[in-house]
Amino acid sequence: MVKTVYVTGYKSFELNIFKDDAPEVHYLKQFIKHKIEQLLDEGLEWVLIQGQMGIELWTAEVVIELQRTYDSLKFAVITPFQGHTEKWNEHNQSKYANIIKHADYVDSIFHTSYQGPFQFKQADQFMLEHSDQTLLIYDEEQEASPKFFKQMLVDFMDKTNYTCDIVTFDELTAFINDLQWSEDQSF
């Protein structure tokens, strides 16, 4: 049974998404919602993110929406270090602040500012050790920052009984096609 899931994947700019109202955001959020609802049916209690723009913040927005129906669902934002949003623009900082306001738990792995890439690696390791499953939205055909986490995830799974759901673009495309078809049928 999966009680705690870590959701991660591409940053928004890695998907060439630069606006919250881009159609891709709608479909990605619907996909994330679908995946989380499946886990909720199996006993999911917590969703963990590190607070990165893109898949992680969209996941937080989905969880906030789902909490209206599933009041036992909780989410945590556990950042690698403090002040990780300082270089973000005002809009993204405001969006992040709103998400933090709704989070059930907020902390940082390192209670310092950025000191080096080791902080990201330690945060990734923490997430693996404190969750039952990872939902990773990543396709090897479009390499980007999640490739480092994916390698750590594969190594971790080899040593433990940890499970993951690695979502490829093919799975996303199939879901989006089905969703678009059902939306077209409802008119």
UniProtKB/Swiss-Prot annotation:
Pfam families for the chain: YpsA
Transmembrane segments: none
Domain of life: Bacteria
Signal peptide boundaries: none
Cited NCBIfam families: PRK13660.1 (NF010181)
Family, per entry: Belongs to the UPF0398 family.
Name of the protein: UPF0398 protein SAOUHSC_01463
Organism encoding this protein: Staphylococcus aureus (strain NCTC 8325 / PS 47)
Lineage: Bacteria, Bacillati, Bacillota, Bacilli, Bacillales
